[in-house]
Amino acid sequence: MVTRDETAEAEGLRPAVGSSRVRTYQVRTYGCQMNVHDSERLSGLLESAGYQRAAEGTDADIVVFNTCAVRENADNKLYGNLSHLAPRKQADPNMQIAVGGCLAQKDRDAVLRRAPWVDVVFGTHNIGSLPTLLERARHNREAQVEIVEALQEFPSALPASRESAYAAWVSISVGCNNTCTFCIVPSLRGKEVDRRPGDILAEVQSLVDQGVLEITLLGQNVNAYGVSFADPELPRDRGAFAKLLRACGGIDGLERVRFTSPHPAEFTDDVIEAMAATPNVCPTLHMPLQSGSDRILKAMRRSYRAERFLGIIDKVRAAIPHAAITTDLIVGFPGETEEDFQATLDVVEQARFAGAFTFQYSKRPGTPAADMPDQLPKSVVTERYQRLIELQERISLEQNREQVGRAVELLVATGEGRKDASTARMSGRARDGRLVHFLPGDNEIRPGDIVTTTVTGAAPHHLIADAPIIERRRTRAGDAHAAGQKPRTGVGLGMPRIGAPAPSATAEGCGC
């Protein structure tokens, strides 16, 4: 294992050493929204260091895997893909493979034991080291493994190459102070570290200046925001997240604000008040339930109970009547009885979720739940999972049918859901987050534009709007998407940058 070299600097590194050809890269992302945004940062780092994104369908000189360790098949997926690259690596020793993210943080040296052709292994706390590690591996002709145990300061200085011209992730924190027994994330991403509000708002402003219309505030537990920079001598200000939402409401040109994910135990009334009072905060809430059984919630070490969860939903709907509420659910947690599972079905029925991400419990080594007795047979978990899916699909369809006849404002998107090509429908997201497939008619509509149309049909996972367009608005985001331009950010906290300086956020041609 190669230890971290504190004196190594990526500044000025160029990947085409000894060659006039610019080397290309590809980032493959597995897992949650955190990983998606981390991959944008990895792309920004590589581009700042002189690499170029590989064209679609071409072989990249550098392949970076940004991994997930939450699901049971994460290992198989990674090592299967690494095996597919082994012949390419053998044929072209100058090709490089890097593995980062949660699985790399967890497995460390095991990655090289199982796939010795990998060049770089890096963790969740040092993604900024990637250009340096790649160059060092090439120069030394030796694999580099660098894992940092803890994040001391939020890495706001890292540039990001965004995937969308119209919508963007903005991290407000990393890590988590909760200790859910099924979750390995806190041990891999560490304790919560929050960004200062000024740095968050500066990044949001930079994105809006480039034409971005929608931002999603991102954290493992967004409504615990502020805990890491609170004065330990003073009572904790639990209103920091609500204040942040209201501050986003004051940014001209920012049309939509979303956030994910809150924790029910930390959810306070001031957040609901801020959601209702801030016009650009979208009428939607994604809040993980995980189980409707109080006994299982206790075993999961989730510090709330079903009654509190349902109480929060009631308050949200009282303040924001048309809010779309979604959740996460786990089926088959160790020791879950039929009675426990029925409690989950009962809460789902009462909550009337617009949608739910449902998971079969996945045993993860290193978590307390993995060592619990009464692990359920796969057949039982699968049968319960199917019953839960059937219930939620029915509720989702009923909820979506209530939207038929309503006018909806859509932010036109690309790559959203499956559409029948023969209908020539486009897709967009309503303000409440629902996916809508709509007919553009004779209008020239681009991803990033805003349209208003009428819902004419419903399915469990989407709405149909085949009515004529009521209104359309061309946007700078639409202009940028059409021109192939995407925003870049690199808002700093005084930390040294990696690689060449990122372009100015207001540089001509960014128009997105």
Swiss-Prot record:
Residues covered by the MTTase N-terminal domain: 23-139
Catalytic activity field: N(6)-dimethylallyladenosine(37) in tRNA + (sulfur carrier)-SH + AH2 + 2 S-adenosyl-L-methionine = 2-methylsulfanyl-N(6)-dimethylallyladenosine(37) in tRNA + (sulfur carrier)-H + 5'-deoxyadenosine + L-methionine + A + S-adenosyl-L-homocysteine + 2 H(+)
Q: Which organism is it from?
A: Mycolicibacterium smegmatis (strain ATCC 700084 / mc(2)155) (Mycobacterium smegmatis)
In the record, the note on similarity to other proteins reads:
Belongs to the methylthiotransferase family. MiaB subfamily.
User: Can you quote the record's cofactor note?
Assistant: Binds 2 [4Fe-4S] clusters. One cluster is coordinated with 3 cysteines and an exchangeable S-adenosyl-L-methionine.
Give every Radical SAM core domain span.
162-398
| Main localization category | cytoplasm
Please give the Gene3D superfamilies that the UniProt record associates with this protein. Answer: Methylthiotransferase, N-terminal domain (3.40.50.12160), tm_1862 like domain (3.80.30.20)
Q: What PROSITE patterns does its record include? A: MTTASE_N, MTTASE_RADICAL, RADICAL_SAM, TRAM
Q: What is its EC number?
A: 2.8.4.3
Q: What is this protein called?
A: tRNA-2-methylthio-N(6)-dimethylallyladenosine synthase
Spell out the residue ranges making up region: Disordered.
Answer: 477-512
PANTHER family cross-referenced by the UniProt entry: CDK5 REGULATORY SUBUNIT-ASSOCIATED PROTEIN 1, MITOCHONDRIAL TRNA METHYLTHIOTRANSFERASE CDK5RAP1
One GO cellular component, as annotated: cytosol
Please name every pair of cysteines joined by a disulfide bond in this record: none
Q: Which residues form the TRAM domain?
A: 401-469
User: Where is the protein localized?
Assistant: Cytoplasm
Detail which positions bind [4Fe-4S] cluster 1: C32, C68, C102
